[in-house]
Curated annotation (Swiss-Prot):
Catalytic activity field: N(6)-[(R)-S(8)-aminomethyldihydrolipoyl]-L-lysyl-[protein] + (6S)-5,6,7,8-tetrahydrofolate = N(6)-[(R)-dihydrolipoyl]-L-lysyl-[protein] + (6R)-5,10-methylene-5,6,7,8-tetrahydrofolate + NH4(+)
Enzyme class: transferase
Keywords for the protein's UniProt record, in alphabetical order: Aminotransferase, Transferase
Stated role: The glycine cleavage system catalyzes the degradation of glycine.
EC number: 2.1.2.10
A GO MF label: transaminase activity
Protein name: Aminomethyltransferase
Self-association and partners: The glycine cleavage system is composed of four proteins: P, T, L and H.
Gene behind the chain: gcvT
Length: 363
């Protein structure tokens, strides 16, 4: 089992540690609800160093990424980031990821931990068609720290006191110095709050983590585990691989058409997406329960006549709303807000209804 560069800090802080994506990761510290609330009201610090980190380099790098990903990398300038997908030819999703354009010939990619080896092999498999492109895996060398919450940017400026990070726009990034090392500070995140994700060499990770914790102490900053990371992303309706998206899911039917640029030219999976887009059959919806029955992944979703419609993708008790919420894969005829849905839990049916995403409106 792998450990991140911050593992010793988590252990000393009394974190509950679990195996996630082959890494020993903190799932919670003080408790999921307290940590979730801290991010929504102040700021929290996440170790997400289990995520995969790739570099794509060379004069053919942009053309390679334009072919391999669903979004339009031609729209990016130096210092911009983009949410995108890797697709299979049949239109299913290999992974969702973020691409960062350092310059026209140098690109950084952050992929899901559980898909890292699969993604690397998938990209490697297609390199042969593009001259002068190198793919490098830097996952073992880099840590990824996320600072998220309404107080996050003020805390960041107390560490980077020269204004190096001031005014970073969403989905933009800067390369800045810290302790003699270069770090990438990107205005991205998985919580719906203001914040950044910082890619830092392992040997500087603990120093940066401690500096951010100290800088945020007056604001009540807390370390946040993967448990609260999941409830935060679900309140925003953000997809998680293996839940809302997978190999069988078309982005057209997963509320991800906005990152599937069918008009940009050919890319892997485009033809299949075009075919689905002509007549999509299903979609992912958000729903809220009227009773305190918490939806869980895999629960069957029914209509009012008790006809099975699909299944729950994700579900939890929302710490912000204090109501059970979830996402479900259903026929498109059931996507309108207010449409009733039913779950069967231990032989009893509970009513909910489709609601507009996100569940919680944030920054």
């Amino acid at each position: 089992m792998k450990k991140t560069a911050l593992y010793a800090w988590h252990e000393a802080a009394g974190a509950k540690i679990i195996d996630f994506g082959g890494y020993l990761m903190p799932v919670q510290y003080s408790g999921i609800i307290a940590e979730h609330t801290c991010v929504r009201t102040s700021a929290g610090l996440f170790d997400v160093s289990h995520m995969g980190n790739f570099m794509v380099k060379g004069r053919g790098a942009k053309a390679f990424l334009q072919h391999m990903t669903s979004n339009d990398v031609d729209k990016l300038s130096d210092g911009q980031a983009q949410y995108t997908l890797l697709l299979y030819p049949e239109g299913g999703i290999v992974d969702d990821l973020i691409i960062y354009r350092i310059d026209a010939d140098t690109w950084f990619m952050v992929v899901n931990a559980s898909n890292m080896e699969k993604d690397y092999s998938w990209l490697q498999e297609h390199l042969g068609s593009f001259e002068g492109v190198q793919l490098e895996n830097h996952t073992e060398e880099l840590s990824l720290i996320a600072l998220q919450g309404p107080r996050s940017m003020e805390i960041l400026d107390r560490v980077f006191t020269g204004g190096e990070c001031s005014g970073i726009k969403p989905f933009h990034f800067r390369t800045v110095p810290f302790n003699g090392r270069e770090v990438i500070v990107a205005a991205t995140g998985y919580t719906g709050e203001r914040g950044v994700e910082i890619s830092v060499p392992n040997d500087a990770a603990t120093a940066l983590w401690v500096a951010l914790m100290e800088a945020g102490s007056a604001d009540g900053i807390q370390p946040i585990g993967l448990g609260a990371r999941d409830t935060l992303r679900l309140e925003m309706g953000y997809p998680l691989y293996g839940h809302e998206i997978n190999r069988e899911t078309s982005p057209i039917e997963a509320r991800l058409k906005w990152v599937t640029r069918l008009d940009k030219g050919n890319f892997v999976g485009r033809e299949s997406c075009v075919a689905v887009d002509i007549n999509p059959q299903r979609t992912v919806v958000g729903f809220m329960m009227h009773e305190r029955a918490i939806p869980r992944q895999g629960f069957t979703v029914y209509n009012r006549d008790r006809k099975p419609l699909g299944s729950v993708c994700s579900g939890t008790m929302s710490p912000t709303l204090k109501q059970p919420i979830g996402t479900a894969d259903v026929p498109r005829g059931y996507m309108k807000s207010g449409t009733p849905l039913y779950l069967e839990v231990r032989g009893k049916f509970y009513k909910g209804e489709v609601v507009k995403l996100p569940f919680v409106n944030r920054a």
